[in-house]
A protein has these predicted regions:
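Adenosyl-5′-phosphate
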Residues: 4, 31-37, 47-48, 170, ...
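Active-site adenylate/phosphate-handling loop in enzymes that bind or generate adenylated species
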Residues: 176-234, 303, 309-332
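Gly/Ser/Thr-rich beta-alpha loop segments that engage phosphate groups in nucleotides
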Residues: 33, 94, 99-100, 193-195, ...
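Membrane-proximal basic amphipathic "stem/tether" segments
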Residues: 210-254, 443, 459
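Cysteine-centered catalytic environments shared across enzyme families
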Residues: 1-162, 174, 178, 368, ...
Length: 464
């Protein structure tokens, strides 16, 4: 292809199947490397010297009270938002129903907020909530409902702009909200980074597992080995997962194909490292920290750089839009790394007798404090992410057939055992398993591969 003449790095493909993004420094193009986050290089006299210039260092400060932390978060975040608003042009703000973007929008005091959604179901469409929130803070909300056909039609162009394949369905939604905002301004604020630095992902709480983890490690390992021999289902998977140490089971927020499953799926042999070989250097840096902090540290170095910020940067730049992230200000980071774990993820029994864990606890209290009373309930809202109805679409004839044709095409036959790909698709359609994320991971690679290695035409915005 004239788009890119480099050879494909098949080791990157194998790791992508597990992580849903490219986690290593060598890219999908053999011999082309990425500079690691927070590093710089000097090339002099034929030698390349790569140095790290910044690193997060979690060290809990036990002296301040919870109220003190809440006030510090509030003050520091206000300063960050004000600094990120400085511009010669109008600034807007993205808005979902989550606490992160709501906190940004409420403090920023911008005139315009932007939201996208899918269909009419509330779990896939936050537009109604965003409009209500915007009205409560006296701002104008601009929104767009993304139709399935335009979502799918934009995939080649979006994978082109990503440079490397990314299987996060939210990247497409992010493209559309960036496009919406770009029609009226050039700079937006967004809420990326809050989950990683303040402890916001649901997996950090892993509710209901702590009692089991108090059992002796040897007993849990024994139960795990028995469970591994049984047919897979939710209960069995719990015992398999909880028999493993954190370093074995957590590689970040996405875990698509296990090393065993990806090797069974691939027709080609690669020299890809095991996922644990990729994560081990990061875990080694936080050996003495608790599990929540270990997960945050890993996500900050892999997930945030390889998925969250990558798609934010690529999709905004594809629309000539500057996206700014006030949660990732160095002063906010310096504060967050000192907050004790018990104020990041808190176990708070409910009146009904349940044992819920509240993530991002101190930050949620700061958001509640700084948000108008009629909108403060967002601070307690369960995290949704950026919901996309992929699992629903893959059961519909149009998109099932579209993916199946790709899974049986020449590129798929080159890299995969295609009968196993089709089996994943058929089992999903029949309701035997939710394989939507696995299917999407493979499909996005094949869409990307077609753009960069099979097509001579750079994809442009479709007329849908």
């Amino acid at each position: 292809s004239d788009v890119c003449s480099s050879d494909l790095n098949t080791a990157a493909l194998e790791n992508y199947l597990t992580f849903q993004y490219s986690p290593c420094t060598e890219t999908f193009f053999k011999g082309v490397y990425k500079l690691p986050p927070a590093h710089y290089f000097i090339y002099k006299n034929g030698k390349l010297d790569i140095q790290q210039y910044w690193e997060i260092e979690f060290h809990a400060d036990e002296k301040p009270s919870l109220d003190d932390w809440v006030n510090q978060i509030s003050d520091t975040f206000h300063n960050s938002v004000e600094a990120h608003k400085i511009a010669d042009v109008e600034v807007g703000s993205f808005l979902s129903s989550g606490v992160d973007s709501s906190y940004v929008a409420a403090i920023a005091d911008v005139d315009k907020t932007f939201t996208v959604g899918f269909g009419k179901e509330e779990r896939y469409n936050e537009i109604g909530w965003a409009k209500g929130f915007s009205e409560a803070i006296g701002k104008k909300n601009y929104s767009k409902v993304i139709e399935p056909e335009e979502y799918w039609a934009h995939l080649p162009m979006i994978q082109y702009h990503m440079d490397e394949p990314l299987a996060d369905p939210a990247a497409v939604a992010l493209y559309f909200v960036c496009n919406l905002a770009s029609q009226s301004l050039k700079v937006v604020l967004s809420g990326e980074g809050a989950d990683e630095i303040f402890g916001g992902y649901n997996v950090y709480s892993d509710p209901g597992s702590t009692s089991y983890e108090k059992l002796p490690r040897g007993l849990r390992r024994g139960i795990m080995h028995i469970a591994e021999s049984l047919p897979a289902h939710r209960g069995v998977n719990f015992f398999v997962r909880k028999g493993k140490d954190l370093e074995e089971r957590f590689i970040g927020n996405a875990y698509m194909f296990t090393p065993k499953d990806r090797k069974a799926l691939l027709k080609i042999h690669t020299n890809a490292p095991d996922p644990m070989a990729i994560t081990k250097p990061y875990y080694d840096q936080v050996k003495d920290q608790d599990d929540v902090t270990k997960m945050q540290y890993l996500d900050l170095h892999l997930w945030m750089a390889g998925d969250i910020l990558l798609k934010a940067d690529k999709m905004s730049m594809a629309n000539s839009l500057e996206l700014r992230v006030p949660f990732l200000d160095k002063e906010v980071m310096a504060l967050a790394q000192r907050i004790p774990t018990r104020y990041r993820v808190i176990h708070k029994p409910s009146e009904s007798g349940g044992t819920p864990y509240i993530t991002k606890y101190a930050m949620r209290l700061a958001a509640k404090k700084d948000t108008p009373p009629q909108t403060a309930k967002t601070a307690a809202k369960k995290k949704l992410g950026f919901p996309v109805p992929i699992r629903v679409w893959l059961k519909e004839d149009t998109y099932y057939n579209m993916v199946k044709n790709t899974f049986e095409g020449n590129a798929a036959q080159q890299f995969f055992h295609t009968e196993k790909l089709v089996q994943l698709l058929d089992d999903h359609r029949a309701g035997k398993a939710d394989n939507s994320r696995k299917i999407w991971t493979v499909y996005m690679f094949l869409v990307w591969y077609h753009v960069y290695f099979e097509s001579d035409v750079i994809p442009t915005k479709p007329n849908v």
